[in-house]
């Protein structure tokens, strides 16, 4: 399957976000995980798990869902411009394909995140693939990532942590 993608695209980026809520205009990305596959379908050295300080209180429901703690974000979170630069750099190439499970959610957050920082131009050359749309064509409801992981017998964890969800989506 990957071979056919690289007939059209020069790289594939798989990403996932964890956020402070569900509104991409007012909530923030708190964790951005992504990896890049080269033309051979091999992971490059550009696997990232970036934690971002939201600059405000983290809703307790988000900590319950993800296990991400506010203190960990404030202590270890990177500046937003550093995170944006790392992601835009991963889009290097003429025709990148950005993939995500439930891509509409992640890409909406990513667009607003990059737009606020004046970096959204990097997305213009990318094309997008929603892995959930493929799963929906093949399996009955429900269509959460955990259902896809279970249905396909993928080893790994869907933990509402960006890096775990990226690896699950890749499989």
What are these regions (language model features)?
Residues 1-125, 143-156, 160:
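Conserved non-catalytic scaffold segment of RNase H-like nuclease domains
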Residues 19-21, 133, 168:
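Short, glycine/acidic-enriched loop or turn micro-motifs at the edges of active sites
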Residues 54-56, 136, 165:
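A short acidic, often aromatic-flanked loop/helix-cap motif at beta-alpha or helix-coil junctions
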Residues 114, 139, 171:
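Hydrophobic/aromatic-lined pockets within catalytic cores
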Residues 127-143:
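Short alpha-helix plus adjacent loop in nuclease-associated cores
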Residues 133-136, 150, 171:
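Generic alpha-helical structural context detector
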Residues 161-171:
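Acidic, divalent-metal-coordinating active-site segment for phosphoryl/phosphodiester hydrolysis
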């Amino acid at each position: 399957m990957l071979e056919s993608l690289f007939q059209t695209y020069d790289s594939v980026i798989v990403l996932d976000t964890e956020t402070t809520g569900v509104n991409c205009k007012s909530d923030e990305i708190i964790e951005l995980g992504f990896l890049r596959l080269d033309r051979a379908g091999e992971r490059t050295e550009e696997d990232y798990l970036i934690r971002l300080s939201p600059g405000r209180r983290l809703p307790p429901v988000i900590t319950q869902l993800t296990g991400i703690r506010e203190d960990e974000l404030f202590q270890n979170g990177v500046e937003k411009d550093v995170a944006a630069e790392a992601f835009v750099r991963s889009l290097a190439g003429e025709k990148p394909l950005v993939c995500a499970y439930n891509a509409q959610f992640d890409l909406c957050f990513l667009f607003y995140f990059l737009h606020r920082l004046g970096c959204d131009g990097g997305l213009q050359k990318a094309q997008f693939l929603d892995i959930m749309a493929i799963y929906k064509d093949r399996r009955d409801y429900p269509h959460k990532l955990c259902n896809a992981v279970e249905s396909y017998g993928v080893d790994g964890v869907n933990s509402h942590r960006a890096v775990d969800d990226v690896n699950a989506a890749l499989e």
